[in-house]
Amino acid sequence: MVAEVAEKWGRVDVLFNNAGVSMKGAPIDELDVADISNLIEVNVMGCFIAARAVFRQMRNQEPMGGRIINNGSVSAQVPRWGAAPYTASKHAVTGLTRALSLDGRPFNIACGQIDIGNAQTDMTKAMSGSGVPQADGSMAVEPVMDVKHVASSVLHMASLPLEANVQFMTVMASAMPYIGRG
């Protein structure tokens, strides 16, 4: 796909690494290993594979450079109860973001991460419906925000000149549980 984009447009300037899946919240010993493996494959390997392909293109194009924006999660900062695989996957994305920032520097490739909390998407339907597990064992409906706020934040990150970078940005529903999660 990267080659097709570069052929059509002459280069690749931005990658928004946005693939991700989650799982039903439960203690780790109750989770299916195949489901955990699938989550890691999508959330971690998906980011690696896309970043690798785009990095190569950005490194070899003239003028050299570009921007990679990884979709993290507030779970990369503060875990949600029963979400060990998802939390671990988003910590891996944070590690990738930091490494790409360093590795990309000589090639004018900037890398940043947006950590999103409770944007209203298909993935967060339960938050405003039946609720999600809380640290105290209860279920609670959590506030969500319009996904357009995420879109405008990503657009801001993407529109900066390569001499500037938003390394990490957190955009979340203002009233969502965050510190101490639940």
What are these regions (language model features)?
Residues 51, 89:
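Active-site helix of classical SDR
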Residues 26-28, 35-38:
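Substrate-binding pocket helix/loop in short-chain dehydrogenase/reductase
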Residues 56, 102-105:
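Alpha-helical segment proximal to the catalytic Tyr-Lys
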Residues 1-10:
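Conserved amphipathic alpha-helix within the SDR
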Residues 78-84, 142:
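Active-site loop immediately N-terminal to the catalytic Tyr-X3-Lys motif
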Residues 73:
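Residue(s) in the substrate-gating loop at a strand-loop-helix junction
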Residues 113-114, 133-180:
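C-terminal helical subdomain
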